[in-house]
Amino acid sequence: IDPLSRLFVGFISLLFFICALYAPSYLRLRFERDNRILVSCLLIVLGMMSLVTLSHHLGLMWIAMEATTLVTAPCVYFNRNPKSLEASWKYLLIGSVGIALALLGSFFLVYAMVQAGSESTLMFDELIEHSHLLSRPWLHAAFVLLLVGYGTKMGLSPMHTWKPDAYGEAPGMVGALLAGGLTSCAFLCVLRFFHIEHIAHGGRHAQG
């Protein structure tokens, strides 16, 4: 585990701890709603966010990010009314588009290794080690797709339209986890790929 992972997993753990302190009183007030699905989904979200922060595997990190999208959608629908249904579907659809772009960017990054004549890999450490060999056009295309894809999960403009509805309809603790936890995980993904891009350019300049 690297220092960046420790920082993010520590922040997410603290965020979940604070939400866990708030959750019992909130759920007692909302006793008319069955909270078993909400609590189960939140526990899975904690596991998936932790996996994102600790993973050094490109594919595993993407799977964990996709899982957070699927598992948090029922949390947005907690109120079970037409507005929360619309918000959850908007969140799910826009988030899925973003994560699909991130998957395409991941494919491009692996293909950049193949184009450079290197063995394809999904491990970040190996990608960083061989980043100076990556095919520059495919590397740039991969970074743009990954930035847009994971930027959608962060709610960056213009793919931010899901945020007002999702934050407005979700319970307060779910909104906090979306704003603090999910955004942080997506930002970490962008940082991982930015590191590869930065090292790739640094290696080329050093060789030049």
Predicted features along the sequence, with ranges:
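Hydrophobic alpha-helical transmembrane segments of multi-pass membrane proteins
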Residues: 11, 93, 144-151, 177-181
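Juxtamembrane helix-boundary/capping and inter-helix hinge elements in multi-pass membrane proteins
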Residues: 78-85, 116-118, 164-174, 199-201
